[in-house]
Amino acid sequence: ALCSTQRSAPVADEMCEQYGIPQRTTNYFELLQWVDVIYLAVPNLQHYRYAKVALEAGKHVIVEKPMACTAAQTEELAALARRKKVFLFEAMTTQYLENYNKIRELLPRIGRVKLVQCNFSQYSSRYDAFCAGETPVSFDPECAGGALMDLNVYNISYIVGLFGEPNQVHYLPNMERGIDTSGILTMEYNSFKAVSMAAKDCGAPARYVIQGTKGYILQKSTANWCGGVTFHPNQGKEEHFNLNGGRPQ
């Protein structure tokens, strides 16, 4: 079953026809009566609200990133899911990809980690409209838009999944009309620093590098794809891996 806004009903009808979806509605509560699992692809600000309603109805929930806008909201949803004995997932698959697991496996071979850098920058198709005075949802501070929530969350998950929670975090955003159109997040660990960059106002090739005393690991695709990985030892030949099947290099 599919639930959409009234405005998006024509598009929803096309999706139902294309994928053989038997039921469509614009009423979220009606949808909850038809399904066992909910996948939420609504604006960031609405994630908490819709997820909570579904969990309270005893439904399993998959939420687009970010799961919620605050840590407190996320913790509340997790507690509710445990109480209702249902599953709650953030729809971010990086940590389950084979290439990502290979990176984790390679970490001991680069020695002591010293620097980590991640760059996920892509010029948004909506940035021109934003510059012209419009306020697309992805650039609306009242809808929890911006580069941190939209793109840098991938980098954060990538880093934290490998190294755990940092000791300190600092965010340096480029602000336009109250929203971060790009920014740099620094994460401080006991013996190394991580830099996480993301931009919606400019583009650059994706680059993920983990530098250690005995070599470095390089990946040239965004965290959500986690494509081909290359291990560059200080001594010896480089090694290339791509274990994700059909995903891009």
Task: List each model region and its residues.
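Hydrophobic residues in well-ordered beta-strands that form the structural core
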Residues: 63-64, 88-90, 219
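N-terminal Rossmann-like dinucleotide-binding module
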Residues: 1-19
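Rossmann-fold dehydrogenase core element
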Residues: 75-93, 112-115
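Contiguous beta-strand/loop segments that form the cofactor/metal-binding neighborhood of enzyme cores
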Residues: 155-228
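Beta-loop-alpha module in the N-terminal Rossmann-like domain of NAD(P)-dependent dehydrogenases
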Residues: 14, 19-80
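Predominantly a Rossmann-like dinucleotide-binding segment in NAD(P)-dependent oxidoreductases
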Residues: 94-167
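C-terminal helical cap and adjacent loop that interface with cofactors, partners, or active-site loops
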Residues: 225, 235-249
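Receiver (REC) domain switch-region micro-motif
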Residues: 2, 38, 116
